[in-house]
Amino acid sequence: MNMFFDWWFATSPRLRQLCWAFWLLMLVTLIFLSSTHHEERDALIRLRASHHQQWAALYRLVDTAPFSEEKTLPFSPLDFQLSGAQLVSWHPSAQGGELALKTLWEAVPSAFTRLAERNVSVSRFSLSVEGDDLLFTLQLETPHEG
């Protein structure tokens, strides 16, 4: 410890002044950075509070929005006997079933619409020509309700 003091007092006054100025500059810099750090932290806290309020407002909007469950029609293969479509066969299964229709080209898209209204999905389908008619075969799946 005495060596440090001996060195300090042995240096020129100009070098000691430069050391004092350097250490004073370092101290001022640390104080300045510390204050900006506090300002950034306070701004971050305000930002988090603002985000929390916005999320709370969004949750209130979601909770107040009316939830309307769409009513689905019950599925019946006889619903597909319309003009331009004739039911050929229906083979029910636990997962859904297979529906075969003799139909016109124009009736094919409406069959998918009617299935969607009844909450029935199509896993596979095929279209084949039999004479003058179109054989439309659908592999259907009903959703599992639990």
Curated annotation (Swiss-Prot):
Q: Give a yes or no for keyword Metal-binding in this entry.
A: no
Give the UniProt entry's GO cellular component terms: plasma membrane
Q: Which parts pass through the membrane? A: 20-37
Localized where?
A: Cell inner membrane
For the null mutant, the annotation states:
Mutants are unable to use DNA as a sole carbon and energy source and show decreased competitive fitness when cocultured with wild-type cells.
User: Which stretch is the leader sequence?
Assistant: none
Q: Which GO terms describe its biological process?
A: carbon utilization; DNA catabolic process
Question: Topologically, how does it sit relative to the membrane?
Answer: Single-pass membrane protein
Q: Name one Pfam family in it.
A: HofO
- Which controlled-vocabulary keywords does the entry list? Cell inner membrane, Cell membrane, Membrane, Transmembrane, Transmembrane helix
Q: What does this protein do?
A: Required for the use of extracellular DNA as a nutrient.
Protein name as annotated = DNA utilization protein HofO
> Which species does the entry assign this protein to?
Escherichia coli (strain K12)
